[in-house]
């Protein structure tokens, strides 16, 4: 788990359109093809108000490549159209504990 970077996109969904769905698919594909990509996980809060997309990467270079991806830059311009609110959290995972039966990410 050393050097793992977790990029969380926590958001309250708004109204999605065709452009959103196209960009979302393109960004997911690009992220998954980066050499440092580990996985992506999505969660919904118990009250279904918030969603969290967590992308795990092996290195910060991959995070920076995703941030500079042209389709990602286009999507950032549409956040007010597609989301009621959002927050980005980028963290370095320094430790991971468990019983060994759950492999995450």
In which residue ranges do the predicted regions lie?
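Short S/T/G/P-rich N-terminal loop/turn motif that feeds into the first structured element of a domain
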Residues: 1-51, 60-68, 84-105
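Arginine/glycine-rich "motif VI" loop of SF2 helicases in the C-terminal RecA-like domain
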Residues: 78-81
């Amino acid at each position: 788990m050393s050097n793992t970077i977790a990029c969380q996109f926590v958001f309250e969904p708004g109204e999605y359109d065709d452009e959103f769905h196209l960009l979302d698919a393109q960004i997911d594909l690009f992220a998954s093809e980066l050499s440092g990509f580990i996985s992506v996980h999505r969660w919904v809060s118990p009250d279904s108000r918030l969603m969290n997309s967590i992308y795990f990467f092996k290195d910060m270079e991959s995070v920076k490549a995703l941030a500079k991806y042209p389709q990602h830059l286009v999507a950032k311009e549409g956040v007010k159209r597609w989301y009621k609110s959002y927050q980005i959290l980028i963290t370095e995972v320094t430790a991971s504990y468990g019983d060994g039966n759950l492999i995450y990410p």
